[in-house]
Regions:
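Short solvent-exposed beta->alpha transition segments
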Residues: 41, 49-101
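Short active-site loop at a secondary-structure junction
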Residues: 64, 170-178, 200-260, 299-310, ...
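Exposed beta-sheet edge and beta->alpha loop/turn motif
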Residues: 97-149
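Short, Gly/Ser/Thr-enriched beta-strand-loop segments that form substrate-interacting elements
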Residues: 97-113, 417-458, 466-469
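Short, conserved catalytic-motif segment at the N-terminal edge
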Residues: 153-212, 232-234, 294
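Short, surface-exposed loop or secondary-structure junction motifs
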Residues: 190-197, 250-449
């Protein structure tokens, strides 16, 4: 689950990937003499001045009124924390976006923390002294994968690459979690680093359960597909037909199950101040209906891709109405149980769940200290995210899914038919998808306070990578993507 605005987040994610992928040919770290470049220079000057109070007063003055107040407040807070903790920043890469020339990307490194961040900004054409788009996202050290090969590697070399990278991240205090790799038949890499609980210094190990954020959407999508197979609904059934209690029936009549699965419903997000001020009121899918219906519609259904946690909560309510079971019971019995996922489930914040790690987050990409994420999460996992699992269970899910144990092959093929363009690839029915070395990498990422996760499956071979972490949101999900690329390049042999 992502809390920040999808348009800003999508742009930031795309330019981050572009910046990281092309570091070898990085442009000189000189800010351009453009409106955005001049504003970036002022911003970095204020960060390096080291006066958080001054930054708090100044930063809002360069933001366009068109940026929503919550987004403004979030960006300003990141800048204040960066000013307080970074010890100043050095610019090490500057570039524009190839498809959006006005979009400026500025990669920096904190002098005190050594952490990296990417500023993403665009000046307002009508008011060039204001930023129409402004964000700061974390990024990994650009040199982290510099020595990684592009083609197939031996199993021993893969293990060496993974251990070296995890050790480097752990030594920099940038990774806490587990990473596992399957060759499609057996687990060939299984590594853990960091702490599951910091107060008592409890280490992560192979039994540790992690919240997995939006990986939960895959389980929700599979549950919907099972009900389609059973003839209890169709891909084209409307929200109005399946959830007649949804308050905004006029909108619901034009939204289909297919659109909800693909994030093309036009609905926004429930992560708004009202939700966080009243978290205890939102536990079951039906509890969210009024809140979701009150949020602005972002686009006409079927016309635009907008990542929507709200859409997946509504899918959870659809599962309940159609099956006659609670969403949580249905997924536990019809998805987790047949896949052999005995260590997966949904917990409430007051539950005692053995081996479940505590989530931690930083206030911004350049922040020095962590905080426990208790107050940043839903009271209970929802159909859009925050279930818990282990790497072993996630690999079991990937195998059961590919082998037709959860839905029939024809249904599975339909789920991946005609994905919607999104990011570096596309978004199918509950799964991200991209091509690498002529093969499909399918799965999902998850990132919210206290969680970073990724399941990446090389579909043609069954090889898969599971990464779980009790820190986030962070960019360590990219490590799983790098490994998936190596797996897609060819069979990993001993």
């Amino acid at each position: 689950m992502k809390r920040y605005s999808r348009p800003v987040a999508a742009s930031a994610s795309a330019v981050f990937l572009a910046c990281l992928a092309s570091v070898a040919g990085a442009a000189p770290a000189t800010l351009p003499d453009t409106a955005a470049g001049r504003l970036a220079g002022e911003l970095i000057h204020h960060v390096n001045a080291g006066n958080p109070d001054q930054m708090r007063r100044w930063a809002p003055t360069i933001l366009s009124a068109d940026i929503a107040p919550p987004e403004q407040a979030g960006f300003v807070q990141k800048l204040v924390v960066a000013t307080r903790d970074s010890g100043g920043v050095d610019v090490h890469d500057v570039r524009t976006h190839p498809r959006q020339p006005g979009l400026l990307q500025v990669a920096v490194k904190g002098r005190r923390t050594g952490r990296h961040a990417l500023f993403v900004m665009e000046a307002d054409p009508a008011k060039p002294d204001k930023l129409a788009l402004a964000d700061m996202v974390g990024m990994q050290d650009p040199s982290l994968y510099a020595a990684w090969p592009k083609g197939p590697v031996s199993q021993a070399e893969l293990q060496r690459l993974i251990n070296t990278t995890l050790d480097r991240l752990a030594q920099a205090d940038d990774f806490s979690g587990c990473l596992s790799v399957s060759d499609g038949k057996k687990t060939i890499v299984d590594e853990c680093r960091g702490l599951a609980e910091r107060n008592f210094g409890v280490a992560n190990d192979h039994r540790t359960r992690f919240h997995i954020g939006s990986l939960t959407k895959m389980f929700t999508a599979v549950a919907v597909a099972q009900l389609v197979e059973a003839g209890k609904l169709s891909w084209d059934s409307t929200l109005a037909q399946l959830v007649p209690e949804y308050p905004d029936q006029a909108t619901a009549r034009n939204i289909t199950v297919w659109q909800l699965l693909h994030h093309t419903s036009g609905l926004g997000d429930f992560f708004v101040p009202e939700f966080f001020q009243n978290r205890e009121q939102y536990v079951d899918p039906q509890d969210f209906l009024d809140l979701i219906a009150r949020q602005p519609v972002l686009s006409e259904p079927g016309k635009q891709w907008n990542y929507s946690n709200s859409g997946y909560v509504l899918l959870g309510r659809i599962i309940e109405n159609v099956s006659g079971e609670s969403y949580f019971d249905y997924v536990q019995q019809r998805v987790f149980a047949p896949a052999g996922m005995a260590d997966s489930g949904f917990d409430a914040i007051e539950d005692i769940t053995p081996n479940l790690s505590v989530g931690y987050f930083r206030d911004g990409p350049l922040a020095a200290e962590r905080k426990a994420a208790w107050m940043k999460l839903p009271v209970k996992g929802v159909p859009a995210g925050s279930s818990y699992s282990t790497n072993a269970d996630l690999l079991r899910f990937s195998r059961a899914l590919r082998e037709g144990e959860l839905v029939k092959p024809a249904t599975l093929a339909k789920m991946f038919d005609d994905p919607v363009p999104a990011g570096p690839g596309g978004y199918a029915a509950g799964f991200g998808e991209r091509l690498s070395h002529g093969r499909h990498i399918r799965g999902h990422t998850g990132g919210i306070e206290g969680t970073t996760a990724n399941l990446a499956i090389v579909w043609e071979t069954g090889a898969a990578v599971a990464l779980t972490s009790n820190e986030g949101p962070a960019e360590n999900w990219l490590l799983a993507e790098r490994i998936a690329d190596l797996l897609a390049a060819g069979t990993v042999k001993p």
